[in-house]
Amino acid sequence: FSYKDRVDNLRMLGIVCKLLLKHNIISVISAINPFESIRQELAAYSPKVKTVWVRCGMETLIKRDTKGLYKKALLPDGNPDKVYQFTGVSDLYEIPKNPDLILDTDKETPDESVKKLTDFILSSINNPVDIQ
């Protein structure tokens, strides 16, 4: 995907969530958002917008990659199987500057990460902020 494709998709997801929020519907976007500027743009919609960084080392990502996309992205240029514009390898991924929650998925068990995320969401719901 191009930069524009990624930004357009993230903005569209943000707009949908903003509309749902006006009706007090909680939304969770599970999307790769590699750009700090777009994270900040989405956060400006409401103080209820939160960033969760699902942090994972490259070695673990490669081990978990059932489609082999990371291995293909790491192939030398010119290789017919190489995947180009792959986020975090050959395309930009900016580490979140101030995530509201970090899930260290290469250090935590899936159950630990789920509990942290669930507790975080429930805490956010139980401590509401006025919609601005």
Language-model features: where?
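Short alpha-helical
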Residues: 34-37, 60, 108
